[in-house]
Amino acid sequence: MIIMNGPWVEKYRPQKLDDIVGQEHIIPRLKRYVEEKSMPNLMFTGPAGVGKTTAALALAREILGEYWRQNFLELNASDARGIDTVRTSIKNFCRLKPVGAPFRIIFLDEVDNMTKDAQHALRREMEMYTKTSSFILSCNYSSKIIDPIQSRCAIFRFLPLKGHQIIKRLEYIAEKENLEYEAHALETIVYFAEGDLRKAINLLQSAASLGEKITESSIYDVVSRARPKDVRKMIKTILDGKFMEARDMLREIMVLQGISGEDMVTQIYQELSRLAMEGEVDGDRYVGLIDAIGEYDFRIREGANPRIQLEALLARFLEHA
């Protein structure tokens, strides 16, 4: 019996900058701020699950020292995106003098979800309290942040983690939790995580909760996604000009494996890209197919019937057979 003790993403969150997985182009620069006991306003941008929040917390611990909790404020812009958040929580925190530290740090996560008005209010607070506080802003898309804020920050672009980096971390957690696992199961987790370590750890914990040895099958039991080999076979079948056979494969995948339309389109894109990288789909054909995938992905997300749209997508693939 596997005994769960809270979310593993928190249990195994690195506490020091040196322990952060990946981001070798960023960590040395952050460590210099620790050495200097000084830092400008920072912006961490990049996809989910790549270490932005972990880096902010580790930096705060190391640069603020013993009293880091008293001098650190964390807010999530997705929970409260209005101007009130900026004018109350941030303003009240910034007005207080640092306690046993050179300055205070405000970490605002998912700041790209703030309204433009809230961002302009934030910019004014950043200007007002430069002597006593520094900001760390985290976002997925820096393009959604107004220029006056970007110009006031040192920008760090976090990259998706590589497969071997994720596997190494999963192996570490599995050892600590005394898990039995197949090596191929971890590779399957990496496939579905797509560079997102948080997603990978959550998948590992979900599979472990089944209380058995972690196998490729147990990963599919918790992930609710199609098996890559089935999607790849369907793509090859339609590109061979066999529409009815490919359509039957599509229906079987969606019905028997319970795959949503959006997930199906995503996996078709992933497997087609892998086929192109392996040289099984030439460049010109790949361009046309990707254009079709983008069109039908949009239609499904706008509410069109997924089954009909996916069969229509196969028909478009037939044009490139």
From Swiss-Prot:
Disulfide bonds: none annotated. GO terms for biological process: DNA repair; DNA-templated DNA replication. SMART domains: AAA (SM00382). GO terms for cellular component: DNA replication factor C complex. Keywords: ATP-binding, DNA replication, Nucleotide-binding. Gene3D superfamilies: 1.10.8.60, 1.20.272.10, P-loop containing nucleotide triphosphate hydrolases. The keyword ATP-binding applies. The keyword ATP-binding applies. Part of the RFC clamp loader complex which loads the PCNA sliding clamp onto DNA. The complex possesses DNA-dependent ATPase activity which is further stimulated by PCNA. In conjunction with PCNA stimulates DNA synthesis by PolB, relieving inhibition by replication protein A (RPA). Belongs to the activator 1 small subunits family. RfcS subfamily. This is Replication factor C small subunit. It comes from Methanothermobacter thermautotrophicus (strain ATCC 29096 / DSM 1053 / JCM 10044 / NBRC 100330 / Delta H) (Methanobacterium thermoautotrophicum).
